[in-house]
Amino acid sequence: MFKVFGFGAKEEIPELSQEEKTKAILKQAHDFEQALRAMDYVLDDNADEGLALLDESDAKEASDQTINALARGVIEFLEATLGFEAEEMKKASATLAKAEALSLKSRERAQKIGLKSSSLYPPGTVYAVTYTESCLLHALLMIFSESMMEAAKAILKLRKSYYMLQEILETIKAANKAKKLKITSGSEDKESTPATFITGGDAFNSVDIPYELTPEEQKDKDLLQFAEQIHSMRTERLSGAHIGNSPAINRLRGELGLQAMEDLPEEEITDHKVLSDDIDLSQATIDEFVHSGVNLCFGILQVVISLLPPAIGAVLSVVGFRGSREEGLRLVWKATKQRNVHGCIGLLALMFYYDGPFQFTDDDFDIPAAVKDSSNSEDSEDEEMDGPTLLHPGKILEDALLQSRALFPNSALWLLNEARMLSGKGRLEEAVALMDSIDVSKIRMRQVKSLMIFDRAITLIHLHQYDRAAEDILSLLDISDWSHAFYTYFAGCCYLENWRMCEMGLMKSDKKDEYQKKAEELIFTSVNLLGKKTFKSKNLPLDRFILRKVEQFKAKKEELGVENPLDGIATSPVHEIAYFYNGYNRMSEEHLELTKKMLTEYRNPAIEALDSDQELIKDLLVSLTLRRLGHIQEGCDILDEKVLPKFFSIQNGKVKYIKKTEDPWAYPTALYERALFTWKLEGMDGLPESKEWLLRAQGYADDYELSTRVGMKIKAAIDRVDHSL
């Protein structure tokens, strides 16, 4: 009956009657709903059930192989990007390539037979969206591979995706305008009127069929039953009833943290209800997929392009790429309002942007965003989130996350993001307590389990709880195939700091000798693991960082002739790791004071040697600690007098850089932080000078380890200044 989307047939596609088209349209909507349900299972930590649903659908005659392939590709993409493991990335790439090819075939067939499955858009539009989505995700995996050949292919894919997304977005805007005009004029279009079934005197409207039915179709019981089934599938998905969980409304909180869970009302509601007023219950499945897919893909694409360093950005602009961070964020926010996988991926992207370890919206660079004048906007919907709200979404982001926590109670991924949000607000103890509330051994998705343990370890070092942080990190050696070298080095740095705290009398422990032994063993053997258990063909940026650090430690030990290898380590390396993961913005005053004490009062032969490069790292970190403690001028003076002169000067009005290689990440970072000092000291009046410092940071152009991380942070800060000047 529904052989329209069968693949492999060479014969010419015959013309279809309206009845055949109606059946094909309903089958398409059904298969898309089935795929959306499968992907939601994965977001609730039940990938096996989701994949089983797709297998079941694949086995049926004339199922929509295109959406099934994309759904499988999205699942594998999530697994690959959460864990960055070679085999997972390879598998996801192959599936997404298949989805690309199937999308083009399906689009062509839908256009040939005139299959109008949307009341707004021309035939085949939904497959243009599946194509761009699979293309974009595939391109991102190619970029992550760090192969020059794959990166070149990725640019071509991104270009195709970019232009098709622009085309679809314009179609959406035009359709929305036409719809508003029809509503205003009161005119009706039979081609966009939902189908009505009549049975036993009752009427049922199906929004999935965008035209009037023939008298025979209106009385077709099989057709009616199928349309009602799709309506039921959609209603259950929108309320969260489709994946076997109890009503989400009973888990919906108004605040973050464990205490808010305990404060939930005891009386339970038995009916499933939608959690947001933004959800449109009358929207057809295909239209919903088109809207959310385009908003998500074009939004993420624009944000990523806007954050790329100037050198890459200039190349992309030549081939037609333009990225607007604000417009991109608005589109991603729009996607989050849809109760489907696009909304969830959009929320994960926003959580990474606002509360991830890199925090592109730096807490210390709290410039108020300029409010954009939207009075002359052609599309008021595009302006519903103004600049200040985009910069600091606050409660809006919290509520979006809490909805996902309620909808997906079995998934540690959403709990992890809540913990990250708590950590971003400086509520570190609460973040650890929340992560401790779940048994990590019961997390099914291995990549999420690894992330949970890693994030907890990072949070623990911000709390100076190094023993437990080291245990967590070392446990990842048996779980994750990411960088075993970094895990080992990280744990060694934790034990080193514990040993130093024992030496300073800040910590009483009978394990002091054990800490010393473990620190020495783990730090200096970590480099032996480089190139092993890593997802790329070459070492990760953090791996290259480790190699350089350990070589420095060994060289200093030989230079000083000390017996204890730990005496060859000056500035405690765990504080560098804390900076990379935004620790200084998250520590309480108590922990900042302890950090300052450890950086300034511990003594050993390497520190007393006053090595210029080691002093630079120490002074940079001390200056940031002072700024967070409120001693802004004192911190700025240290940066100006002890850090910047070692690699930067202004001669005859021109900037001069002294190229150094000892700690490459530190030099552009110091210039970036100097911009933040100017902002803290001078406010809005200092923004022009802040921008000068940021441009100098950007101008320290070099391909150094962590350059992508530092470069994107600098670029985001420049954009913020530009919007406020």
UniProtKB/Swiss-Prot annotation:
Any one GO CC term of the record: nucleus
Presence of the UniProt keyword Cell inner membrane in the record: no
Primary location class: cytoplasm
Pfam families given in the database record: Iml2-TPR_39
Keywords attached to this entry: Cytoplasm, Nucleus, Phosphoprotein
Modified residues annotated as Phosphoserine in this record: 246, 377, 380
UniProt keyword Phosphoprotein, yes or no: yes
Phosphothreonine: modified positions: 196
Cell compartment(s), UniProt: Cytoplasm; Nucleus
Entry's family note: Belongs to the IML2 family.
Note: Present with 1770 molecules/cell in log phase SD medium.
Protein name, entry field: IML2-like protein YKR018C
